[in-house]
From Swiss-Prot:
Membrane topology: Multi-pass membrane protein
Gene3D superfamilies: Mitochondrial carrier domain (1.50.40.10)
Domain of life: Eukaryota
Name of the molecule in the record: Uncharacterized mitochondrial carrier P23A10.06
Record bears the keyword RNA-binding: no
Length: 335
């Protein structure tokens, strides 16, 4: 096939072929290690991003978040608006406690461990298949396919995590149990009124954000990686191939994650609106309403904290995954 011939040279250097293959259990453990490191690092940035978006949506909406309605009804004051991503970290740490920056850590881990495992294993299984079939942009198609599966699996967990982070500012420090109970009560009421399938209420918006994100991320990651592999300055960077690989994966993941974030930010804002406020509006109606009331700025609210979160998240995840997988490949007798 002509397409396959045109892409053969490129596909031969894809990341999935750059290191010895390991058994699925080693890949799963590698994905889990990367997920834990990434989550511990970027959860504070995710808390700030969710709070900023929730505040913006409340500003342009006449309704309160579902899971915080009863809280505010009890007379609890709304949290002071955050000034921005950097000052937001300081404000939350000062007024709600440093531990509040890791609010939603457990559901984040519960969500990311299976999500990243499915994502990375799925990508590595599908990429050679699509490449053999001669698909153009095989990396984009493989990334989008793997992300569709993983996002659907973890959507209810992400819904819970998003609401925990959004309403946490209505409680003083040290009330994690009360926050979780309040969110659980809101979810139970939602299931009773609208059915259990509403736990996937944000999955369509999540897919609209994550599928294009993953497609562009994996496509650009493979291309940036190939560019860095052939760059002359890299040859003088380090004599160790492991160090070079770590650098290439880290930089490629960070740049690709940033570019993909800029493209998909409006979908992230509409996803947060859907999960936090529980509107019956469609994705398009959400985005149109925000555009009319706040302009383009409303649709790209939280772009900086999301970029600050996603760039290191992608860089850490992809580099730690390949580094851990390389370790397992050198310890093949144990696996």
């Amino acid at each position: 096939m002509q397409i396959g011939a045109a892409t053969e040279g490129v596909e031969a250097d894809l990341s999935v072929n750059a290191e010895p293959d390991v058994k699925p259990i080693a890949k799963m453990l590698s994905a889990c290690v990367g997920s834990v490191i990434t989550t511990l690092t970027v959860t504070p940035l995710d808390v700030v991003k969710t709070r900023l978006q929730s505040e913006s949506i409340s500003q342009y909406s006449s309704t309160q978040p579902i899971s915080s309605a009863k809280i505010l009804g009890k007379g609890r004051p709304a949290p002071k608006p955050l000034g921005g991503p950097v000052s937001g970290l300081y404000q939350i740490a000062r007024h709600e406690g440093v531990r509040s920056l890791w609010r939603g850590l457990v559901p984040s881990l519960t969500m990311l461990l299976p999500a990243n495992t499915v994502q990375f294993l799925g990508y590595e299984q599908l990429l050679p298949l699509y490449s053999d079939w001669g698909f153009p942009a095989a990396a984009a198609i493989a990334g989008a396919s793997a992300r569709t599966i993983s996002a659907t699996i973890v959507s209810p967990i992400e819904l819970f995590r998003t609401r925990v982070q959004a309403v946490g500012g209505h409680y003083p420090p040290g009330h994690a149990r009360e926050i979780a109970n309040e969110v659980f009560d809101g979810l139970k009421l939602m299931i009773h009124q609208k059915g259990i399938l509403n736990l996937w209420s944000g999955v369509s918006v999540t897919l609209w954000r994550d599928v294009p994100f993953s497609a562009f991320y994996w496509w650009s990651y493979e291309r940036i990686r190939l560019f860095l592999l052939g760059h002359p300055s890299l040859q003088a960077f380090s004599s160790s191939q492991s160090t070079k690989d770590l650098y290439i994966n880290f930089v490629s993941g960070g740049i690709s994650g940033t570019l993909a974030t800029l493209l998909t930010q409006p979908f992230d804002v509409s996803k947060t609106a859907k999960q936090v406020h529980g509107h019956t509006l469609t994705r398009g109606q959400f985005m149109l309403t925000l555009w009319k009331r706040g302009g383009p700025k409303a649709l790209w609210k939280g772009t900086l904290p999301r970029c600050v979160k996603v760039a290191p998240s992608c860089a850490i995840m992809i580099s730690s995954y390949h580094l851990t997988k390389k370790y397992f490949s050198e310890s093949v007798d144990a696996y």
